[in-house]
Amino acid sequence: MKKSFSPNFNTPRQDFSKEELNKLASNGIRGNLAREFRSDTPDLAWEAEALAKSHGVYLEFNRAVTGDPKEWMYLIRIGVPGGGPIAREQWRVIDELSEKYTTDPQGNTSIRLTNRQNIQFHWVKKPGVIPIVKGLAEKGLYSLNGCGDNTRNVLACPLSHYSDVFNA
């Protein structure tokens, strides 16, 4: 007979990853993000980069360009609960922010719809991160938990298998 499994959610602190220790020391996942995103450097310190993911912001670099210095840029992912709906005014601000702050190497704006029903801004330079996040929040769109080791969009109810409609 199989023995039942009892998970242990009490991981000893000495077994935490450096990312988890960084979060615990970050004052509620805030850390130095405000200062880091306002600094003149194009990238972020490791601690801020790790925390930025929980705020829906990835630090990336142009892999088509070799050598140093790296061409740093950011990806910002909006979490769209349940995949939508998105109001006309929200689409308008997404489009306006994309036009103003995203430009790929060919000079095109870069916004993408993902297979997880999210929206991503690509090729964002550091000075554009705060205005994009702020502009989205003013219209009820948020990047919080858009990246990193967070629960992302729920595309279907976890209890849907109890639904006669779902099981039809």
What are these regions (language model features)?
Residues M1-I29:
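Intrinsically disordered, low-structural-confidence terminal and linker regions
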Residues Q14, K18-L24, E47-E49, K53, ...:
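Residue-identity detector for glutamine
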Residues K70-A168:
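Small-residue-enriched alpha-helical segments and adjacent helix-cap loops
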Residues N27, G31-G84, R152-S163, A168:
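Short glycine-/aliphatic-rich beta-strand segments at the starts of folded cytosolic domains
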